[in-house]
UniProtKB/Swiss-Prot annotation:
Expressed constitutively in a variety of cell types including macrophages, microglia, neutrophils, T cells, marginal zone B cells, keratinocytes, splenocytes and intestinal epithelial cells. Forms arc- and ring-shaped pre-pores on top of the membrane at neutral to slightly acidic pH conditions and converts to pores upon acidification. Undergoes transition from the pre-pore to the pore in a processive clockwise hand-over-hand process. In the pore state, 2 alpha-helical regions refold into transmembrane hairpins (TMH1 and TMH2) in each protomer that form in the ensemble complex giant beta-barrel transmembrane pores. Its main location: membrane. InterPro entries: MACPF (IPR020864), MPEG1 (IPR039707). Proteolytically processed in two steps to generate the Macrophage-expressed gene 1 protein, processed form: cleaved by trypsin in proximity of the helical transmembrane domain releases the ectodomain into the lysosomal lumen to orient the pore-forming domain toward the endogenous membranes, and processed by the asparagine endopeptidase (LGMN). Proteolytic processing in antigen-containing vesicles is pH-dependent. Monoubiquitinated in response to bacterial infection; ubiquitination is required for vesicular localization and antibacterial activity and can be blocked by bacterial cell cycle inhibiting factor (cif). Induction: By CSF1 in fetal liver macrophages. By interferon-alpha, by interferon-beta, by interferon-gamma and by bacterial infection with E.coli and M.smegmatis in embryonic fibroblasts. It comes from Mus musculus (Mouse). GO terms for molecular function: pore-forming activity; wide pore channel activity. It is a multi-pass membrane protein. One of its GO terms (biological process) is adaptive immune response. The record marks N352, V353, N357, F358, N359, F360, K628, L629 as: Cleavage. This is Macrophage-expressed gene 1 protein. The gene is Mpeg1. Coiled coil: none annotated. It is found in: Cytoplasmic vesicle membrane.
Amino acid sequence: MNSFMALVLIWMIIACAEADKPLGETGTTGFQICKNALKLPVLEVLPGGGWDNLRNVDMGRVMDLTYTNCKTTEDGQYIIPDEVYTIPQKESNLEMNSEVLESWMNYQSTTSLSINTELALFSRVNGKFSTEFQRMKTLQVKDQAVTTRVQVRNRIYTVKTTPTSELSLGFTKALMDICDQLEKNQTKMATYLAELLILNYGTHVITSVDAGAALVQEDHVRSSFLLDNQNSQNTVTASAGIAFLNIVNFKVETDYISQTSLTKDYLSNRTNSRVQSFGGVPFYPGITLETWQKGITNHLVAIDRAGLPLHFFIKPDKLPGLPGPLVKKLSKTVETAVRHYYTFNTHPGCTNVDSPNFNFQANMDDDSCDAKVTNFTFGGVYQECTELSGDVLCQNLEQKNLLTGDFSCPPGYSPVHLLSQTHEEGYSRLECKKKCTLKIFCKTVCEDVFRVAKAEFRAYWCVAAGQVPDNSGLLFGGVFTDKTINPMTNAQSCPAGYIPLNLFESLKVCVSLDYELGFKFSVPFGGFFSCIMGNPLVNSDTAKDVRAPSLKKCPGGFSQHLAVISDGCQVSYCVKAGIFTGGSLLPVRLPPYTKPPLMSQVATNTVIVTNSETARSWIKDPQTNQWKLGEPLELRRAMTVIHGDSNGMSGGEAAGITLGVTIALGIVITLAIYGTRKYKKKEYQEIEEQESLVGSLATDATVLNGEEDPSPA
């Protein structure tokens, strides 16, 4: 009976606790409870998510969202999370405009203008890998066209995050994984994880979005049409506007009818047209603006976004469980990963379509449009290798110079050290060891052991140190890797008559000595440069002394192209501008760029972090692996442990000595017991022998007495 009453009492306590919870936390957490209680829709256009500012793509959620309080917008129309607030547009904000974009360099996104125009990092390439931009650039260049854009925008809310918003669990865990590697001084692994963070969460965090709808028409019109009407560019935009209004069945005013002939010319010169509907009801031919606008309320989308770089949100108040200096190091690691993402997707070159040096792949102008080409001689490449551990790796990494047959440059050329890196390969082999117990009982134990072989390679290319004879160098026929093609052949191969030379881990450099047959496949070569070494050919004076610092760029009249990203280091090569610019635009190069180590190096166990600016120290609890601010007594104890460990024997040594002493004592005790038992057994045998001897003597005496004194018969 008592147990039954106790069970009822516990049930009542749980029920009361559930009843005291806020509305949004009863039973199943989430917006569904609020939605059922308030009978309102949930606002889906929310900030706090990650954003890839190169591709204009929403990424993983960075800021946490909860619906504990069942908040609503100020006008009571939508349910919103606790971590955001809205600014409703009280007035009607229907905007219509028409514009001409003469060059793709003036591109502006329809739905992410604000975040693309922020000035942090490499803002010149923001949005340059979005589908919208790449379509516009391709059509402008291929059709020799300009772009006209007409749009109708209706903004309903501006939704912003609160300053007290917390980081999401998934994002926090990813940061903690990076922190764990930084604590252990595993810098390469931390860099790899930071690049994965960029892959999953983007480069920025959205802090504000405009919720509404937009109807956009983009036309591409021949450039000649705009040049013929340069003095009346306004009438060109007006013609674009009339074409748009005709699509949405809008009644055109009588003033526009006089422009019928210009509108017809506009339509006849239009090479491409597209109408997009962002939010509202789906667009269809013949829809009216009135019908489209009435459907906006229940179909809101983001029509503009604003935000800050991802590393801005990695700060001590967002990660209170970590030491301040460690958070600062974490933020710097993530910022560096974002910069690498921008750097590896920045393609300098001539962006003027009318220049003979125009580079279709370039997304940033480098003032090479008017430069004249200088003929340079290519002295070949070679690569040295040194085994560091494990199996033989250098046989696949070494490369001799085709001109010398050795690891050297021909006379008149100087070597330029491009890069040195360590190559790792994992392998397993059967290893057998003899294991003994008490040095008596032995057996052979075999197991499959995983090991890492390492080798260091050093890549060089040869530059002419002065005047060299004609046809003394090699012909250059492009490069390719196991993941990229050679622009000369559009395949992973060299042109006919060319030989692939190995450089780095996977790069193939196509060269030829045949000036008669190979010349038609050759391209003017302007040098190599890497993340650590510039190009001596940029300045003719530095070519004479390759040890002098040189710029990481191409000479005038040459454009740079990616050769390979070798373990986080970009290596580029230079060819004559205007070559290798055909085909479609290059896709974005996504991280990670760094190879994770096959096996972790010797880790450093960080237990104390001190901030030199505030003189505050953090101690890591070995039981929970949690950080906390250290009290003076705890700091002294921790320092004593650290210095004690360093001055005394290690844990392994202490354990070994303890085990040895224990075994020795066991042997001594065993021998003592064995000796004692053997000694006692010997005593027992002597006593038995004595008793036996006495008994036999007594028997003999009795017999003798019987013979001497026989009893009377």
